Amino acid sequence: MNLIYQDEKVSSYTDEIIRGSGVVEIQLIKNELTIFNLDDTVYEKITFKNDSYYLENSLSEIVARKVILAMDFLSLEFDCKKFEEDDEFVYIFINKELMKIKNNNYKLNYYEWLDYVAGCYIKILRGNLLLIQTEYGERYAHNSEDAIFSVKEIVDDKLFLKSTSTGCCVATKNLEGVVTWREGDKLLVDICVID
């Protein structure tokens, strides 16, 4: 788990395990997010008001795909089960447990895993270096660790990557190659890069 957001109320971590069939991005309609346990009791209610937020049940740690509660950078992304537009609930994973939110209370964007990863910036992690092609054959690029890449193509568990040229994430290395992005349900790269 990598820490992606922290303030005086809560710490938010990204999950290294892939859960569900995809990721749901939640956009608030009424300045609040209510997450229910499976028995319909309230797990947590986050209310946003006056550039701040309030936690009804004082949740201090969040493990999800990407949760940033700062109003200027608000992001609410959760691994989820696939859902239909007319389903009453959307089943999401938070703190490694299955919970639910009411479908019609939010504007939701659903991404299958491959589509979600294709739109992410990728950070190479130690022990899973980028494999590059050189004039002498293939080799692992030791300077790829912690470098940031954009996704060119996904084939099964392989990502074909190119170093970013957008100015994002202070990219200074000009690299491209392939990396294994998952092993079963475990992520082998960081897909939650925050610039």
Q: Where is each model-derived feature located?
A:
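A short macromolecule-binding patch
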Residues: E97-L108, G167-D190
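Disordered, low-complexity tails and leader-like regions
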Residues: D156-F160, T172
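Contiguous hydrophobic, core-forming segments of folded domains
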Residues: F73-I101
